[in-house]
Every structure is written in C-alpha cells, then in structure tokens.
Design a protein with these regions (language model features):
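Short Cys/His-centered divalent metal-binding micro-motifs
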Residues: 42-79
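C-terminal, charged low-complexity interaction regions
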Residues: 117-258
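Short cysteine-rich clusters marking metal-coordination/redox-active sites
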Residues: 11-14, 44
Length: 258
C-alpha cells in the first residue's frame, strides 16, 4: 500500500481533504539537499507541487529557500575556512564576484520578485514545522500565512538579525549533516503573545510575523527587547532589520570579509 503523509488528512494550505486530494509526496520541511530529514504531514500533493513550481517572472518558492540557505552554508564554510575557494560556489540564480563583493541575478528575474519568493518560502517552512509539532496547522489564525505563502496574496513582515559576528554555535556546517530548526513550547508561547516566531537556521536568525493582529499590538516591543539580547554591538550598524530586499540579509556574508 502506498504511503500517505497524513495525520488529520486535511491539507494545511488549501484545506482540502481526501479523497479530493492525495498526500503521497513526502514534503520535506527543510529541503533534503540542505540536510533536512523531517517530513511534514497534511500537505497535499497539489500544494506540495505548487511550492516547487516556478511562476512567470519568478523561481519557485522552494527554489528560493534552497538557493539562499545553500549560499549561507557555503559562505559560512568559506568565512570559517572550512572551504578555501569561493569559486567553488555554484548557483542557478546568482553569480558572485569575489573581488567586488557583488552578485548578479543569472536570469531575467527582478530582485523584488526573488525577495518576495524567499519571504514566502520562510513562512512555508514555518507552518509546516508548526503543524508537525502541534497538529494545529489548519487553525484559522494562520490564514494570513496561508494566503501569503501558498497563494501569493498580501504580505507579511520578515525581520533579519544583522550582527557583525558569526553565530555558528549548534550550526551544521557539513553538507551531510542533519538540519532542523526548533519549535519549542516556549517559542510557541512567545508567538502567541507577540505575533512573531523566531527562526534560527545556519547561523542566521529571522523573525516572522505569523499573527499580524497580535504583532500590531505587541510586536514592536518584542523586537525591541530581542534587540537588547540578540545584537552584539561591534560596529554600530547592528540591527533587527525589516527585509525589503535580499541585500538586507547579506546572503554571501560580505560583512565578514576583511
């Protein structure tokens, strides 16, 4: 009998149930090529396929997550001398120029389109991980996440912790290491109180506005408090910054090049 990846049998994205939709495709939460082993539940084959399909003017949502975090991992290895030569970096989307510390987009995509697809990808992995842990991904309170990540409707804020040190503790560097991110009861409680979920992966910390109404009331104070503990004051430009462009998240870790 063919394996199904279900708990409730109701897709957390489109809300459809068996037999209207099927659940036979293994939905990796973090892409397997990045070392992700966790398999999500209740993501129907149609929605799983949609996240992996390019749309006109943009690469797929899943491709953007993979490209950004592959770059993060490679250049983290480069900056920590695990890898010696930046010319080993290969990407379908980006060309990186070591001498000028600049990059170009290899296709006709705009940086705005790539930024939006990346943001959608981060919210995708959030809800799939949340559902795996809580079995509550169909909760109506996440409708804004579903609209944005799955259907490209509306917008949600994403913030990035910009530090001038490498946060490598508990960060898998090898390309064969198992990669995951945490979803603890404490983190869920913080999310319920502030509207934000904190995602830490490959040494980078993001804050996702997953409950916009709650975030509108308590989010600014939460981010201000987080800045006091998460930022290491070194050069004076450290901040928890709103992501409006891929340049805001320093994919190639150029701030660590001397």
């Amino acid at each position: 009998m063919k394996k199904e990846y279900i708990n409730t049998g109701k897709c957390i994205w489109c809300g459809k149930e068996k037999p209207e939709v099927s659940f036979y495709t293994a939905p990796h939460i973090v892409p397997k090529c990045l070392g992700g082993e966790e398999i999500g539940k209740d993501i129907c084959d149609d929605c799983n396929h949609a996240f992996g399909t390019a749309i006109q003017g943009s690469p797929s949502v899943d491709a953007m997550f993979r490209e950004v975090f592959e770059a993060y991992r490679f250049f983290l290895q480069l900056r920590t001398n695990e890898i010696k030569d930046s010319r080993r970096y290969k990407s379908c989307l980006f060309s990186y120029f070591r001498k000028t510390r600049t990059f170009k987009i290899n296709n006709s995509y705009s940086i705005n389109a790539l930024t939006r697809q990346f943001k959608r990808s981060v919210f995708e992995v959030f809800l799939q991980k949340y559902h795996l842990v809580t079995n509550d991904g169909n909760n109506p309170k996440f409708q804004a996440v579903r609209d944005f990540a799955r259907y490209n409707i509306g917008d949600l804020r994403l913030f990035y912790t910009f530090n001038n040190i490498l946060l490598t503790e508990n960060t898998p560097l090898g390309f064969d290491e198992n990669v995951t991110f945490f979803m603890t009861p404490k983190m869920i409680d913080t999310m319920e109180r502030t509207g934000f979920y904190s995602l830490y992966l490959f040494g980078h910390n993001f804050y996702l506005e997953v409950l916009p109404f709650t975030a509108s009331m308590a989010g600014d104070q939460y981010l201000s408090t987080e800045a006091n503990t998460m930022l290491v004051r070194a050069k004076g430009n450290e901040s928890i910054r709103l992501v409006t462009s891929l340049r805001d998240i320093d994919i190639f870790l150029d701030r660590f090049v001397k």
